[in-house]
Amino acid sequence: MVDHISPRASPGPIRSSQTRRARKLRDSCTSCASSKVRCTKEKPACARCIERGLACQYMVSKRMGRNPRAPSPLDSTRRPSESLPSAGSEQGLPAHNTYSTPHAHTQAHTHAHSHPQPHPQSHPQSNQPPHALPTPNGSSSVSAIFSHQSPPPLVETQGLGGDLAGQAQSTLSSLTVDSEFGGSLQSMEHGNHADFLAESTGSLFDAFLEVGTPMIDPFLESAPLPPFQARYCCFSLALQTLTCLFPHAPLGCQLRLTDGEDSSCNLMTTDMVISGNKKATDAVRKILGCSCAQDGYLLSMVVLIVLKVLGWYAAAAGTQCTSTAAGGETNSGSCSNSPATVSSGCLTEERVLHHPSMVGEDCVDEEDQPRVAAQLVLSELHRVQSLVNLLAKRLQEGGDDAAGIPAHHPASPFSLLGFSGLEANLRHRLRAVSSDIIDYLHRE
C-alpha cells in the first residue's frame, strides 16, 4: 500500500510543471485600461502611449489560465461523493485564500500534496466562475458571502492542516448573521436600494419614537382623580376620616366659598356628631390593628383624628368654651350656653347646633337639652378612652423604634420625646374634656 501512495505524494513533477509556466500579461496596458480605450497591444509600448509620451506598462493578469499538466488517472477514478465542491461552497473559505498569487497557489498545492491522503484534492481556480470570486473593489455578490455559512467538508480541512482548519471553522462561525439582515442584503443586491433604505430608516424612526415617547402607566390613565383613592389602604382611610371631621371651612380661610353660605346652615347636630365620632373611632381602631400602625406618619394622623374627635365631643356637650386647648386653664362663664344657640367654640372650628329638641330617640325640652347632650357625650367617652390606651401602646412602640434613629432623621416624623409627648397630650386632653363635662353637670 505504501508503493501505491508514494508516487502521488512526491511533489517533484507538480513543482516542475508549474515553474515552466510563464506568467501571462494583460492584453491592455495600464494607461489604456484606466482610460477605458482600446489598446494596440504592442510590446513593449503601445502606439497610444508612444504618441502621448506615457510610460507603457503591462500588468500581470490575475487569470492564470488552465493548468497545462495532463490530468491524473486518479481523478477519473474518484468517487462522486468526493468530487470537488461547488463554487458557492468554496466561497465559505477565508477571503485570503481567494486572492492568491501564483507563488501562493504553488505553495498551497505543494503543502496539500506533502501530506499523504487517501484522496488528494486540487483546487484549480479556472473552474470557478468569475462573478463568484469576491474582488477587492466590492463588486462581488453580497448574498454569496453569507449564503453558505456551513463549514467546509472534512476532506478539504484535513489537507489544510489542523491549525488552519480550526482557524477556517472559527472564521466561518463568526460570519453567522440574522436572517432578516440577510434578506435585507439580498434585496439590496437585486437593486432594491430604495426599499432597503426605507425599511432601515423606518425601523430606526419607529425605534426613536418608542424611546422618545414617554411611557404612561395604564393604571394612571384609568384611575380616577386623585389617584390615591383607588389605592385603598390605611393611609387613605386615615385621610378620608380626617377629611370627614372637617365638614366646614374655617371662618378666616381665604379659599372659603363666597356663595352666600350661612353660618347656621349645614351645621352639625348632636346626633350627627355622635354618629360621626363612632365611625371615626371604628376606623382608627381598624388602623391600629394593622401592621401599618408602625409607621410614624400614620400614627401622627391617628393622633390628629383622636384630638379632633375630642374637640367635636366637647362642642356637642357645650363645654368647649370653658376649656381651652390641652394644658390650658379653664375659663368658666366666658360663654353662655343658652338654648337655640350655636356653640361656635370661641375661635375653634367645631360648630354644633343645639336648637333641635330631639337628642337621640328622646324628645326633651329646650331647657333640658344641653344637660341631656352633655350626659350623652359623657357616656360615649369610654370609646375614646379605650382608643387612647391602644394608641399609647403603638406610640410607645414607635418611640422604641425611634430611639435607635438619630434626631431629625427622615425615617420618622418624631423623635423619642415627640412620641411620648403625643401620648401625654392625648391623655391630658381626654381628662380635660371629661372633667369639664362633669363640672358642667354639677353646676346644672
Swiss-Prot record:
PANTHER family: MONODICTYPHENONE CLUSTER TRANSCRIPTION FACTOR-RELATED, OLEATE-ACTIVATED TRANSCRIPTION FACTOR 1-RELATED. Involved in the regulation of aflatoxin biosynthesis. May have a role in nitrate assimilation and sclerotial morphogenesis. It comes from Aspergillus parasiticus. Pathway: Mycotoxin biosynthesis; aflatoxin biosynthesis. SUPFAM superfamilies: Zn2/Cys6 DNA-binding domain (SSF57701). Residues 120-130 have a biased composition (Low complexity). Residues 106-116 have a biased composition (Basic residues). The keyword Transcription regulation applies. SMART domains: GAL4 (SM00066). Pfam families: AflR, Zn_clus. The keyword Cytoplasm does not apply. This is Aflatoxin biosynthesis regulatory protein. GO terms for cellular component: nucleus. One of its GO terms (molecular function) is zinc ion binding.
